[in-house]
């Protein structure tokens, strides 16, 4: 089942990249938290990370705020 947090990250990432069809978000369990793995095309990684990591930080902040209601901790990994 796809969570709201997965949909949120995928939606935003698709808006940022040149190849939205290659954006996937998978969830895997970690120690005390859920890990969301965001996969994008290798040429789009810079767009998802942003200058000095600002976009990645903003994505993680949105993920944290969204997950607060469900009381689940998430970590976001960006993979090319």
Curated annotation (Swiss-Prot):
Which biological processes are named by the entry's GO terms?
cell wall organization; peptidoglycan biosynthetic process; regulation of cell shape
Q: From what superkingdom does this record's organism come?
A: Bacteria
Cellular location of this protein? Cytoplasm
**Pfam families hit by this protein:** KH_KhpA-B
Tell me yes or no: is Cell wall biogenesis/degradation among this UniProt entry's keywords. yes
**GO MF term set:** RNA binding
Keywords attached to this entry = Cell shape, Cell wall biogenesis/degradation, Chaperone, Cytoplasm, RNA-binding
SUPFAM superfamilies associated with the record: Prokaryotic type KH domain (KH-domain type II)
Asked if the Swiss-Prot or TrEMBL record annotates the protein with the keyword Cell inner membrane, the reply is: no
Which chain positions lie within coiled-coil regions?
none
Q: InterPro entries under this entry?
A: KH_dom-like_a/b (IPR015946), KH_sf_prok-type (IPR009019), KhpA (IPR020627)
Positions of the KH domain: 33-80
The terms describing its cellular component in GO are: cytoplasm
Question: In UniProt terms, what function does this protein have?
Answer: A probable RNA chaperone. Forms a complex with KhpB which binds to cellular RNA and controls its expression. Plays a role in peptidoglycan (PG) homeostasis and cell length regulation.
HAMAP family in alphabetical order: KhpA (MF_00088)
Family from the record? Belongs to the KhpA RNA-binding protein family.
- Quaternary context: Forms a complex with KhpB.
What protein name is recorded for this chain? RNA-binding protein KhpA
